[in-house]
Amino acid sequence: MKIGRLLLLLALTASCAVKPDCSLQRIGEGFAATTVNTCVFRGFSVTSDDNWRAAAFYDADSYVNIAFQKQGSDTWDVTRTQYKGNTADAHNVISIALDGDGYLHMAFDMHSAPLKYCRSLGPYGAVMGDLQPMTGTGEADVTYPEFHRLSNGDLLFFYRDGESGRGNLVLNRYNLQQQQWQRVQDVLIDGEGRRNAYPQMYVDSNDGIHLSWVWRETWDVSTNHDMCYAYSPDAGVSWQRTDDTRYDLPITLSTAEYACRIPQESDLMNQTSMTADASGHPYIASYWTSDERGIPQYRLIWHDGRKWNESTVGRLSQPFSLAGGGTKKVPIARPQLAVTNDGVYYFFRAEEFGSKVSAFHTRKLTSEKWELLELTDFPVGEWEPSLDSEALKRESKITLFVQNAGQGDGEQLSDCPPQNVYIMDIR
């Protein structure tokens, strides 16, 4: 199906007038009774290389749809695949990547479930092959699939093996020349059977892997605590701290480097985002409560080459608390980060700002002055931001997946009907 390019001039605030132009391209209509299409931890919802862009979403009937656009084109080709997912559970996200030969890799529909992975039958094609294993081991209890591409065209694949409160982080690598997956780390971060790590990661332009995570002691989100960090210079084989001391693997509670100490019952959210700048310095986005007012605030944790720093991003005024299990319905989105030559962009959505696609922006972190940008003139419900990290690294281009979506608390369905799916480009 050919879908013509629909450019919508976005209503921007006066503070955004000096920013690059924004455009929306409609690519289809997606399931919206949960946030399964719009969770921040989709790795990735939209991706690209020098030749093509690709995006994936569940349609109104819960079928996986793949959209391709040739770079420079005004149209998207959208294909409904043979695969369906349990869209009632927002954990069952679709994650995609393009390897160095242009083949699309996809993992989807997993929340403590057997691996569902397939590859396209041809380069830049949406005809997907049969489900297949990767390594064939440790693939029975998978959650949070996330792909990353290396500069030579190989892929990395991270996932949690095990359940909330007692899972381990696993890492595979796809060898482009051999066209097969290999295990790199069986247990990169070990919860020791008592806790698990909720990670976020970023592969920088030099193939350095930046990994950060919070610990969770039980299934209850209120037991999230602390923010930890590790870095790999060799595609996940060895890992080190910011002082260059090497980790003995697996990393545990007692051996981890702590970027920021955050106690339990601080409304600390898991599965947020991180990035790195051109110098390889890591930036981590999250939110938590740290004062008597009980209002969670957006935070930025970053390393400047000498030490870890932490600051509040903007100012929120709506109180809420995090407790219990499942997908939480809260008034703010988990944030997404982009670092460009123009500074730091901190993407979010908050009820008190009209639930629109929004961002805080600063050119100088040390000033702690953040400019508020409104990027849509319409609300997006419970949407969370996910972006094309390849476009960001390749050409400093910010591309977001945008869709209005509802979400009930604890995996409950909302009454939100199917909604338009857009790709937003910010120059």
Regions found by a protein language model. Name each.
Residues K2-L9:
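Sec-dependent signal peptide recognition
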Residues L9-A17:
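Hydrophobic h-region of N-terminal signal peptides that target proteins for export
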Residues K19-R427:
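Extracellular, repeat-based ectodomains that mediate carbohydrate processing or recognition
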